[in-house]
């Protein structure tokens, strides 16, 4: 279901929600990936229970990848750079 701000809802051992966003690239662990405005807003609202599963070196033929998890102080571990802008024509 798109638009929720995360991909997978899980729970920790105490039953608290854990919101998981999965980001996959064929490139290295440092290859850029994209987060939507909605995903960033959800991350900021759920800092203690949000994590990003970063899959990289993805091989389609074997459906395999390397992985690490960003889950504590995510904003301090990533750089966000705007890459697109919404454009609206002004009324004249």
Where are these regions (language model features)?
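Non-catalytic C-terminal interaction segments of nucleic acid-processing enzymes
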Residues: 46, 75-92
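Catalytic cores of nucleic-acid endonucleases
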Residues: 22-73
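Core nucleotidyl-transferase/polymerase catalytic module
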Residues: 1-3
């Amino acid at each position: 279901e798109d638009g929720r701000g995360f991909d997978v809802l899980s729970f920790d051992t105490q039953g608290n929600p854990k919101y998981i966003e999965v980001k996959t690239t064929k490139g290295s662990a440092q290859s850029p990936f994209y987060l939507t405005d909605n995903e960033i807003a959800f991350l900021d609202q759920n800092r203690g229970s949000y994590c990003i599963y970063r899959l990289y070196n993805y091989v389609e033929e074997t459906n395999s990848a390397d992985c690490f998890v960003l889950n504590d102080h995510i904003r301090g571990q990533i750089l966000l750079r705007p890459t697109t802008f919404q454009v609206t024509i002004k009324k004249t």
